[in-house]
Design a protein with these regions (language model features):
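Catalytic-core regions of core metabolic enzymes
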Residues: 1-286
Length: 287
């Protein structure tokens, strides 16, 4: 579920905000500030009254109602925070940067399940967990660098891997490539690559939307939906290029260790991409 509060939030809270810009909670707040976000910005940090010039609250229960919550706190604390924010603070979008979920342990997977049940019950979006975030021209909710030039006619990048997204951004920035949006879906507990493509297809604006989509996929949860919406976007004039990681046995293990993903066979991926009209790339440099 992709809500308007994820794409165009009028207010954002960073839970676990920090004055240390080398921590995710500090880096993402810095990027929001330097990116010129014009909405209401709040921080939650029990040890500070102000973080990077932003008013800080001791607990999530103390903040005003907010559209988007970014969580940079230990995984074990996330389910209760999400419940409070969704139930009491009307939050309709969550970005969870934290690792330590289903990509690591069974206990972590249980935490993810609790979070998913909560966000679905309250009709909220969830990016992550275990991701670098999301950005568009409205807000730079990522903890990584670089921040590329953002333009409605730029490229849409959807990546299962935050590290790969950063690598692609670093390469693209040196070439002057502009972006419309960057989606780091991480463990993709609610929103995966297929969901983003579906949203882009169903809301496609031929006059204003980007026509170039770059995908880095670690698992394909719903091949039929990916095929349908990729094919539809291509018929509308879009170009889609993609890497499917983990096609080899060693690559499958790497993909699984990163996101808890189960990789698809190489022959199935090849057939799917060919049928959809997706240009398959075999390296990040090629993409």
């Amino acid at each position: 579920m992709i809500t308007s509060q994820l794409l165009h939030p009028a207010s954002i809270v960073v839970v676990g905000a920090s004055n240390n810009v080398h921590k995710p909670g500090g880096a993402i707040l810095k990027n929001l500030l330097s990116g010129g976000y014009t909405g209401e910005l709040r921080a939650v940090n029990p040890k500070e009254t102000e973080v990077q010039g932003v008013a800080a609250f001791a607990d999530v229960k103390d903040i005003p109602d907010t559209d988007l919550a970014i969580l940079a706190i230990p995984a074990a604390l996330c389910p209760d925070a999400v419940e409070m924010l969704a139930a009491e603070k009307q939050v309709k979008a969550f970005i969870i940067l934290s690792a330590g979920f289903g990509e690591e342990t069974h206990e972590g997977a249980v935490l993810e399940d609790r979070i998913l049940e909560t966000v679905n019950r309250y009709g909220a979006s969830l990016i992550g967990p275990n991701c670098i975030g999301f950005m568009n021209s409205w807000h730079h909710s990522v903890f990584s660098q670089p921040i590329p030039q953002l333009h409605p006619q730029g490229v849409d990048l959807i990546s299962s891997s935050g590290a790969t997204a950063v690598f692609i951004l670093e390469s693209a920035v040196t070439k002057g490539l502009q972006f419309n949006s960057v989606w780091s879906v991480g463990n993709a507990k609610q929103i995966g690559v297929e969901d983003v493509l579906q949203y882009m297809d169903e809301h496609f604006d031929a006059e204003n939307d980007s026509r170039i989509k770059l995908l880095y996929i670690e698992s394909i949860g719903d091949p039929d939906r990916l095929l349908f919406h990729a094919s539809s976007l291509i018929r509308k004039g879009c170009k889609i290029a993609a890497i499917k990681s983990g096609s080899s046995e060693s690559g499958s293990r790497a993909a699984s260790s990163h996101t808890g993903a189960i990789a698809s066979s190489d022959s199935a991926v090849e057939a799917l991409f060919r049928k959809a009209g997706i240009v398959r790339c075999y390296s990040r440099e090629e993409l």
